[in-house]
Amino acid sequence: LNAYFCQFYLSRPYPDLIVTNRIINVFSEEKLEKHHIVPLGSVSNIGQSSAELRNDKSNILNSPLNYIYVTDITNKEVSSKSLSEYQEMIVEEARASLNIVNYPIVKDLSDHDKIKSWLLERHKNVKGEIQKRVTKLLSS
């Protein structure tokens, strides 16, 4: 299911997460990687490695709604950032194009209630985008 959400966004051009002039689409020449919008990279403060979290499919952070494609360059650039630094790096154009509105301001990744609330809001936005696209396709 993660791949379907990523592919839905990939079906139309969107700006890279942190660099506006890096456009991502199906024809991107840069290597693309799946990326957690709420990243796993700063998990040391809850005693779990990012590899452990990645493998825990029941963890809320592995929700399909928490994935997008970014360039490998961007993935490397943000991987070592704290959550607060990472949140500041996301450009407005990417937030709008990828339905990353009201990004959850969390101190650490154990704040599951805030993350869940944000994922539910993103679900509503993504669902609306899909319905709009399907309606447009059916009416043409």
Task: Please describe what each predicted stretch is.
Residues N2-A3, L65-I68, K124:
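Non-catalytic, well-ordered alpha-helical scaffold segments
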Residues V43-I46, V78-E85, S110, L138:
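Short conserved micro-motifs at the rims of enzyme active sites and ligand-binding pockets
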Residues V38, G47, L65-I68, A96-K107:
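Short acidic (Asp/Glu) and glycine-rich catalytic loops that position anionic groups and cofactors
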Residues I60-E92:
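Short Cys/His-centered divalent metal-binding micro-motifs
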Residues H35-V38, I68, D72-N75, K127:
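Generic hydrophobic alpha-helical scaffold/packing signal
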Residues L1-I37, G41-S42:
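Aromatic-lined ligand-binding clefts that engage carbohydrates, nucleic acids, or primary amines
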Residues N25-L65:
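Histidine-centered nuclease catalytic patch
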Residues R95-S140:
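C-terminal, well-folded lobe of enzymatic/effector domains
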